[in-house]
From Swiss-Prot:
GO terms for biological process: photosynthesis. PROSITE patterns: PHOTOSYSTEM_I_PSAGK (PS01026). The gene is psaK1. This is Photosystem I reaction center subunit PsaK 1. Keywords: Membrane, Photosynthesis, Photosystem I, Thylakoid, Transmembrane, Transmembrane helix. The chain crosses the membrane at residues 14-34, 61-81. One of its GO terms (cellular component) is photosystem I. It is found in: Cellular thylakoid membrane. It is a multi-pass membrane protein. Gene3D superfamilies: Photosystem I PsaK, reaction centre. The keyword Transmembrane applies. It holds the Pfam family PSI_PSAK. Belongs to the PsaG/PsaK family. InterPro entries: PSI_centre_PsaK_sf, PSI_PsaG/PsaK, PSI_PsaK, PSI_PsaK_bact. It comes from Synechocystis sp. (strain ATCC 27184 / PCC 6803 / Kazusa).
């Protein structure tokens, strides 16, 4: 019973396309820029192998901004799909 109700509450998801990838990449770039401006101690913790490639971020900052970017991207993709843009 519960799984049937859950299945009816989940909207139809979008199949992957270059548009979807572009939106996800844009959201991750936005999240990295937001992290660059707001994280006070960006290089604290485990350093990344090529820190210049990662903008001087430590492992925690990279994981945090990438996670935020993916959460933001999933929301934007679902929102644009519901609006019919994607």
């Amino acid at each position: 019973m519960h799984s049937f109700l859950l299945a009816t509450a989940v909207p139809a998801t979008l199949s992957w396309s270059p548009k979807v990838a572009g939106v996800m990449i844009a959201c991750n770039i936005l999240a990295i820029a937001f992290g660059k401006l707001t994280i006070k101690q960006q290089n604290v913790g485990t350093p990344m192998p090529s820190s210049n490639f990662f903008g001087g971020f430590g492992l925690g900052a990279v994981l945090g901004t990438a996670s935020f970017g993916h959460i933001l991207g999933a929301g934007v993709i679902l929102g644009l799909a519901n609006m019919g843009v994607l």
